[in-house]
């Protein structure tokens, strides 16, 4: 009996591969999804996870999955971490970093603000959210679609995007096509943009750290204030809190 159940499940999955997914924008349900998810509790069953993406309307899960992960998979491979979505240890972190993968694009997470542009425009440009060319523009015009809403729920200002991986933050690329655009790192017209969105690719990271292992001993003795700024920054930038 169990074998028959899984056979039906596989056949339904094959049917979904060669069929059109439900359209969230039109709230249009497909009959096959109604058959697969006749018991709606299966919408939350991991066994049906692979079929859920094509039946978001039936499962009332459009808001949960229709967003972008904040960072491309080249920076944080959410697909590989999908098994941690509901783990006790990492669920909150996964909700923040991988909402689209985990189906956590709710109003308390990815959609805290609204798009400025028309919905159809943002949806059509969604695949460009993490591109170098359109990163800033789409962060401004389509913050909800691109999952770049600030935590306070207000629309972001004109300038958005990364900080170039400077200071104490981990140095990572924000855009997903940095390697393709690597030749722009040294081009005057693009260098500022590239260093901000692709600091790792452009070798423009400024990781804050102490150069001298004696800093923990020197700093309590007044090293930060006794010597000139350049010497302090060169030796104990992190301990003296003067990172660029």
UniProtKB/Swiss-Prot annotation:
Q: Which residues cross the membrane?
A: none
Q: What is this protein called?
A: Uncharacterized protein ZK643.6
The signal peptide annotation in the UniProt record is: 1-19
Please give the superkingdom of this protein's source. Answer: Eukaryota
Q: Which cysteines are joined by disulfide bonds?
A: 113-149, 122-142, 129-146, 171-205, 178-198, 185-202, 208-243, 215-236, 224-240
Q: Where is the ShKT domain?
A: 67-105, 113-149, 171-205, 208-243
Which Gene3D superfamilies does the protein's record reference? 1.10.10.1940, ShTK domain-like (1.10.10.1870)
Q: Which UniProt keywords apply?
A: Disulfide bond, Glycoprotein, Repeat, Signal
Keyword Cytoplasm applies? no
Provide the glycosylation site positions: 45, 77, 152, 158
| One Pfam family linked to the record | ShK
């Amino acid at each position: 009996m169990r074998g028959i159940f899984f056979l039906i499940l596989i056949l339904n999955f094959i049917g979904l591969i060669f069929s059109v997914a439900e359209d969230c924008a039109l709230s249009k349900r497909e009959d096959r999804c109604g058959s697969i998810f006749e018991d709606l509790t299966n919408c939350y069953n991991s066994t049906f996870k692979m079929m859920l993406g094509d039946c978001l309307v039936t499962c009332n899960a459009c808001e949960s999955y229709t967003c972008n992960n904040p960072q491309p998979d080249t920076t944080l491979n959410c697909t590989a971490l999908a098994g941690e979505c509901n783990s006790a240890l990492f669920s909150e972190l996964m909700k923040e970093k991988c909402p689209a993968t985990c189906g956590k694009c709710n109003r308390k997470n990815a959609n805290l603000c609204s798009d400025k542009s028309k919905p159809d425009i943002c949806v059509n440009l969604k695949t460009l959210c993490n591109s170098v060319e359109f990163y800033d523009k789409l962060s401004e015009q389509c913050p909800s679609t691109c999952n770049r809403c600030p935590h306070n729920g207000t629309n972001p200002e004109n300038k958005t995007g990364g900080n170039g991986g400077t200071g104490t933050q981990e140095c990572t690329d924000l855009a997903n096509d940095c390697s393709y655009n690597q030749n722009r790192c040294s081009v005057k017209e693009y260098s500022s943009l590239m260093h901000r969105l692709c600091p790792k690719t452009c070798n423009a990271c400024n990781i804050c750290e102490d150069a001298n292992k004696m800093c923990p001993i020197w700093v309590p003795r007044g090293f930060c204030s006794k010597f000139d700024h350049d010497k302090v920054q060169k030796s104990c930038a992190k301990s003296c809190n003067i990172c660029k």
